[in-house]
Amino acid sequence: LCDAHMHVESGMVTVTEFARAVIPHGTTSMFIDPHEIANVLGLPGVKLMHDEAMGLPINIWVQMPSCVPSAPGLEHAGAELGVEDVAAAMQWPNICGLGEMMNFPGVAAGDARMLGEIAATQMAGKTVGGHYASPDLGPAFHAYVAGGPADDHEGTRKEDAIARVRQGMRAMLRLGSAWYDVATQVKAITEDGLDSRNFILCTDDSHSGTLVNDGHMNRVVRHAIAQGLKPITAIQMATLNTAQHFGMERELGSIAPGRRADMILTSDLAALPVELVMARGEVLAENGALQADIAPYPYPDFARGTVHMGKQLSAGDFDVEAPAG
């Protein structure tokens, strides 16, 4: 199973520990956007997570974060990334594209920096991730899509999913710890008959408790089936559709000669119990238990102690005075 868009940092764990948590649930590929570490450590932080991901037994591709900082002038970020940084990162082996382009007003208005980041990604032949968090599906949305983003996961309504597909995007339907957008948007397939090949499943953000108690992409697929999708269609939306979107269908997304031997064994396509997990031909988990020996990643000193409060805190700093009377 593939997670087409997600942020490891939402789990409050490292890439290695996240992989350890999701492998028993059948996840063998992830497309991560390390936006949070980019806001703190800049390009070296992104490279750190990229290199950590490359050493793991499942496929983890990195989307180079865009819009760093995410709200210029409204926050004190630890770093700022520009077009040159994006262009440089596109040469790294495990970079699959540009992370979600959150500055949708800027793209629609022709902001030079945003369009430059998109152009650098497209020149490298990679995929531009979208983030259009607005109910306005008129000219502003059309201008945003024309700017280059190829997918979007911010839809919450059936009409959002329909609009994205009609404009040539892939609609990513997310079920995470705080996002419950599959049920409403999947109706574009089950009710309106849109081609399911233009839809992809993802999580976006999963807290550690969700991973432990509920699962990962297996949870999303089960939920999609419960909303009326045929099991094989829901599975396709978490495998082959994702691979094709990122131009990796010759490597993954299907069980066929020449592909990576990433697969799960299950006795029930609808209930989807994950009984065995293989990645690159190696058994990594069986009956919910991790079998692979995955060593912790040694984070360097520069990645530690990055919270700077400006002063030494005391208990009194957390006092809240009651108003008089």
Label the model's feature ranges.
Residues L1-A19:
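Di-metal (Zn2+ and/or Mg2+/Mn2+) metal-binding site signature of metallo-dependent hydrolases
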Residues H5, G26, M49, L98, ...:
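Divalent metal-coordination and catalytic microenvironments
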Residues H5-E9, H35-I37, P65-S70, M101-F104, ...:
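Active-site beta-loop-alpha junctions enriched in small/polar residues
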Residues T16-T127, D192-L194:
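Divalent-metal coordination cores built from histidine and acidic residues
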Residues I23-P24, V212-G228, I232-G325:
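Active-site microenvironment of metallo-dependent hydrolases
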Residues E100-E159, L175:
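Divalent metal-binding pocket/active-site signature
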Residues A140, A146-E251, A261-L272:
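Active-site-adjacent C-terminal substructures of enzyme catalytic domains
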